[in-house]
Amino acid sequence: LDDFPTRKHNRLPGYDYTQPGCYFVTICSKDREHLFGRVVGADVLIGPHVQLSEIGAIVKQTISQIPLVDLSIVMPNHVHILLRLPAAGDGPMETSAPTRSVPWIVRYLKRTVTMACGKTVWQRGYHDHIVRGEADYLRIWNYIDTNPAKWREDRYYTETEG
C-alpha cells in the first residue's frame, strides 16, 4: 500500500464552495501539453497575446457562456478564471445551489470542451484560491491580465511551443 503515491487534495478542507464570493481557478491541459495555442507578438505593437488553437477557441467560447466569470485567459497549457458566485437570488444564474458552485462550473467547462473536442484535453483536478478582499482580487486580476506578457516566467511554462 505504501508503494502508491498519495494524491494531494487541492480544496480547502471543510470549505463550502457554494458560498458567495470570488474564486481564482486554474485548470491545466492533460500532461500540460500546449493544446490551447501559443503566445505570440512580443515584438508587435499590441504586445504578447495568445494565438488560440482550435481547441483553445472552444475553451474560450465555453468560458464565455459562463455568466459568473469576471475575467479569464486561455494560455497554451492552462486556463485562469476569476469567478464571482453571487448570493442566492442575486446575479445572472437563478438556479439551484449545486449549479452555483466552483466544482460544478469546472465540471461544466471540462465536460463541454471534452465533448466538443471528442477527446480529453484536461488534467485531473484543478487549483483554486479563495479571493480574500479587494487587494487580493486586484492582484489576481493583474496576474491574469498580464499572463501572456509574463509567459516565460509562468510556473506552467514549458519550452514546448505549438
Say what each PLM segment does:
Residues 1-162:
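Short catalytic/metal-binding and nucleic-acid-binding patches
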